[in-house]
UniProtKB/Swiss-Prot annotation:
Record-given protein name: Protein SlyX homolog
Region (Disordered) location: 51-70
Pfam families named in the record: SlyX
InterPro entries: SlyX
Highest rank taxon of the organism: Bacteria
Family indicated by similarity: Belongs to the SlyX family.
HAMAP family: SlyX
Amino acid sequence: MTDKTFADRIDALEMRLTYQEETIETLNQAVTAQWKQIDALTRQVAELGERMREAEANRPGPTNEPPPHY
C-alpha cells in the first residue's frame, strides 16, 4: 500500500471517530436528561403516595352504628 492509501484510511478513521464522539456526547446528554426526569417523577410519585396515606388516615372511619332503617 502506498502512503496515500494509508493517509486516506487514517483520514477516514479520524472522521468516523469524530462522528462517534459526537454521537456518544448526544446520547450522554439524552441519558442525563432522562435520569433527571426519572428522578423528578420518582419524587412526585413518593409525594403523591404520602398525600394519599395522609388523606386515608384523616378520613373518618366507618362507624358501627346500624343504618337508620333498623
